[in-house]
Amino acid sequence: MVVMAPRTLFLLLSGALTLTETWAGSHSMRYFSAAVSRPGRGEPRFIAMGYVDDTQFVWFDSDSACPRMEPRAPWVEQEGPEYWEEETRNTKAHAQTDRINLQTLRGYYNQSEASSHTLQWMIGCDLGSDGRLLRGYEQYAYDGKDYLALNEDLRSWTAADTAAQISKRKCEAANAAEQRRAYLEGTCVEWLHRYLENGKEMLQRADPPKTHVTHHPVFDYEATLRCWALGFYPAEIILTWQRDGEDQTQDVELVETRPAGDGTFQKWAAVVVPSGEEQRYTCHVQHEGLPEPLMLRWKQSSLPTIPIMGIVAGLVVLAAVVTGAAVAAVLWRKKSSD
């Protein structure tokens, strides 16, 4: 069996756990984790990661030489040794719980011990511009499919199938929703406020995108216009194409926002246009760091306007690095297991 690399785990997480988009001016804290069984190769691997907005700040990997919760942002490094000891202790407890849960779920689904399986988890809270809780959420996924989710009222659960109904009944018997609600309405909000204050220079900044439009001939009769937005933060951005002032939806390709590896993000939107009609098309960019929305056209020149290979290669590689994997047990101790 091939052992999964962290990048693969991130892709699994992004595919199964749906992230709620934060509103403009809002902030979020999210923890993700993934436990992957590997029969014949020891205990399941457990990876965990925490994010404030679009910035990773903690990381844990059970396969490291000395597994500990580690800082990934300068503003969290100032926390004392007691903080990191508790983070590590709680994360290891969460990892052990998920290893047991993997065995339990394999039994629920009557699956072979020889096959590998994945349990994913996400919890988080969003704050509005007034600093109050907008929403809280917790989700579980098994083998890349929805399993169990805390409802928006933070008082009840939604089970995806018959097996998940068993876990739902266990959560209800243990008053798990009440525990989660206390964390999401209290501890999560308090720590998010603390992190936003300690890391305000990084977390509350708004870096505007660097934008340009490139031209790529496809056939003699049509071409692709690609609108680029590079180096922006936070990640939320809107790119649209218009033809003669009307929004275009057909023949438009829009990629997901991707991390650039330096704390900023990248995105592009492309549209296929008839050759000779390029100037009828405009790209419109909206981002928090811009004083007003931008409107761009392709500027024809004697040189080809293809993006440099470094940018293209970087985007391809970075497409696999998505917000993914960490642990809410960092801030609350998981008291029930499937």
Curated annotation (Swiss-Prot):
Residues 115-206 are annotated as: Alpha-2. Residues 333-338 are cytoplasmic. Residues 209-299 form the Ig-like C1-type domain. It is a single-pass type I membrane protein. The keyword Transmembrane helix applies. Residues 207-298 are annotated as: Alpha-3. It comes from the Eukaryota. Residues 25-114 are annotated as: Alpha-1. Disulfide bonds join C125-C188, C227-C283. Keywords: Cell membrane, Disulfide bond, Glycoprotein, Immunity, Membrane, MHC I, Signal, Transmembrane, Transmembrane helix. This is Patr class I histocompatibility antigen, alpha chain G. The lineage of its organism: Eukaryota, Metazoa, Chordata, Craniata, Vertebrata. The gene is Patr-G.
